[in-house]
Amino acid sequence: MLDKACEDYPRKLDVEINGAWPLEILIPRFLTLSDHPSPKMRAHAISCLSSFVPIGSQSLFAHIDTFIACLFKRASDQDPSVRRHVCQSLVLLLASRPDKLMPEMANVAEYMLYSTKDRNENVALEACEFWLTFAEDPDLAPQLHPLLPKVAPVLLDCMVYSEDDLLWLDGESDDAAVPDKETDIKPRHYGGKAHGLDHEGDQQQERRVGAYGEELGDEDDEDYDDDDDFADEMSTEWNLRKCAAAALDVLAVRFGQDLLSVLLEPLKNKLWSEDWLSRESGILALGAMAEGMGLRLVSSPNPHNLLRRKAA
């Protein structure tokens, strides 16, 4: 509950009450809880602390060195939720207090590169946000430029579709020439409600069944509404792939030819790969970099529907 309050109302908590500042008591307590045996408590503590970074809370900044030391200590935590909040905190610090990270940037960069490749996509996404934030600040360009040879290829690899993406894209295959199966065209459910017919009085409501023969209750109607919106949500949801593409886009604007020199060989390998997923990620990368570098994509025949759409 306190975690949510810190996240939603950090400014309301960073106030003076009867001559005292509650955060001056809470911040040291959160720092102590970051070492709690429970990973859930550690994650909540770091999350609470990070909520006060964007507002420039002096109660937190009075302990900023201790906070950063706490993040470094928890960087290798076994719990992915804790690591995710560590990455998130480092992103917020980079945006608000880059001066505090620059002395340790070599170590921070190595950690964030490692985390960008984390198996847990939530951790990887937060780490990828670090590079997007880094690239968006023109004042940090001199510090980011030497990291391009390491950062850019990692971002390129992050643009390959994940297993979850592929599950969603299963319906995107080019199957116009394939006859529909019965399950493709069968209505989801039958019955009065499906056709806007209501039953009143003592009339027995018509039995409704789903596409697989199961009997449906009233609560299932909302489930179907949710299912209808699921594809749209998936297509617009911010994820690792989109974050990496956005970071490459900004890097292209910022560094232009220098970025292309770094990515020329990896891009060539992607575009000539026998794996269509790798080829697609290469095309996406070129598209992301095109505006910053003045590139133009030329459409060419390709056997996979998604590849044709990307190159068009």
Where are these regions (language model features)?
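Hydrophobic residues within the alpha-helices of tandem HEAT/HEAT-like
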Residues: 1-10, 34, 45-56, 71-75, ...
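Long coiled-coil heptad-repeat alpha-helical rod domains
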Residues: 245-246, 272-273, 277, 289-296, ...
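Alpha-helix N-cap/helix-start positions at coil->helix boundaries
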Residues: 37-40, 78-81, 119-122, 238-239, ...
